[in-house]
UniProtKB/Swiss-Prot annotation:
It comes from Karenia mikimotoi (Red tide dinoflagellate). The record marks Y164 as: Tyrosine radical intermediate. This is Photosystem II protein D1. The gene is psbA. One of its GO terms (cellular component) is chloroplast thylakoid membrane. The record marks A347, C348 as: Cleavage. Chlorophyll a PD1 binds at H201. The chain crosses the membrane at residues 32-49, 121-136, 145-159, 200-221, 277-291. It catalyses: 2 a plastoquinone + 4 hnu + 2 H2O = 2 a plastoquinol + O2.
Length: 360
């Protein structure tokens, strides 16, 4: 009797589990969920709701750990531009700070626990989205290049939100989740690490602006060389079908136009090589930028040319590097002005003596 009941129970549960597995992994649904999606949906939903609530109503956060809280929510005198989810307090360092680690909810909010909640759930969510792209490509029999391409922004987000705060020893050094907070993070990053003079950042700039240029060039060339398959009074869109085997544009005509516009070997005559280049250029550049931020997280900073060129009378002839250094010092003085009086560069007596001729 006991074995009969167990067999009936197993027969009732197995079909339901198999139905759930087939529903999760099927590619026939309007939106593919996948096993990674089972992790992506709750984490991204949690991060989104926590961010919205924190941006609207979070109390001020003691970001510097000196009992001088900074407000970031709309209910505390901020607007869309100045509002942000403030990073966790410097008093927390890189400690994991969930709600149950605080004595009360007020203490958790005061120490910026909202920031860790949003960032960690967001990080898990985007990594799950990355895995979901691979999973869908695998089930459709596609190559995994979409997954590889999306790894670039995931690497950049990981460098800014995870690697850099850990390298600096505190999540208070992470990027605030807001518009003005992002710009503040960029200025402070330049002041402390001289990122503009870092070769890996230069690759990233070339990737972003170059990728935008190549995308605009490719899109305009394709649109200008579409093969017309309809009559004059019909829309050109009626001549194409999704998934058709024939080309929709004349790559030879586009190649000839661009070759005559610049020079012959400046354009691609192979569609696969062209699109691989369009995908690889920005992806590799963003990878290198993420590597640069990760190295600067451990203070392997950009190139710094400290020695000025002196004329015959001993007066310095300032170069662009000197102007950049002076700007960095100014930005660093304004950063955390209540936490310390001077940045480390100005707290050194030798540095002050070396800067004295420039001041004079």
């Amino acid at each position: 009797m006991k074995s009969t009941l167990l067999n009936k129970k197993s027969q009732q549960t197995t079909p339901a589990w198999e139905f759930f597995c087939s529903w999760v992994t099927t590619t026939e649904n309007r939106l593919y969920l996948g096993w990674f999606g089972c992790l992506m949906v709750p984490t991204l939903v949690s991060a989104t709701f926590a961010y919205i609530i924190g941006f609207l109503a979070a109390p001020p956060v003691d970001i510097d750990g000196i009992r001088e809280p900074v407000s970031g929510s709309l209910l505390y005198a901020n607007n869309i531009i100045s509002g942000a989810v403030i990073p966790s307090s410097n008093a927390m360092g890189v400690h994991f700070y969930p709600i149950w680690e605080a004595a009360s909810l007020d203490e958790w909010l005061y120490n910026g626990g909202t920031y860790q909640l949003v960032v960690f759930h967001f990080f898990i969510g985007v990594c799950s989205y990355l895995g979901r792209e691979w999973e869908l490509s695998y089930r459709l029999g596609m190559r995994p290049w979409i997954f590889v391409a999306f790894s670039a922004p995931v690497a950049a987000a990981s460098a800014v939100f995870i690697v850099y705060p850990i390298g600096q020893g505190s999540f208070s050094d992470g990027m605030p989740l807001g518009i003005s907070g992002t710009f503040n993070f960029m200025l402070v990053f330049q002041a402390e690490h001289n990122i503009l003079m870092h070769p890996l950042h230069m690759f990233g700039v070339a990737a972003v602006f170059g990728g935008s240029l190549f995308s605009a060039m490719h899109g305009s060339l394709v649109t200008s060389s579409l093969l017309k398959e309809t009559a004059e009074f019909e829309s050109a869109n009626y001549g194409y079908r999704f998934g058709q085997s024939t080309e929709t544009y004349n790559i030879v005509a586009a190649h000839g136009y661009f070759g005559r516009l610049i020079f012959q070997y400046a354009s691609f005559n192979n569609s696969r090589s062209l699109h691989f280049f369009l995908g690889a250029w920005p992806v590799v550049g963003i990878w290198l930028t993420a590597m640069g931020v990760s190295t600067m997280a451990f203070n392997l900073n950009g190139l710094n040319f400290q020695q000025s060129i002196l004329d015959a009378s001993g007066c310095p002839i300032n170069t662009w590097a000197d102007i950049l250094n002076r700007a960095n010092l100014g930005m660093e003085v304004m950063h955390e002005r209540n936490a310390h009086n001077f940045p480390l560069d100005l707290a050194c007596a030798n540095c002050l003596l070396s800067l004295w001729p420039m001041v004079g």
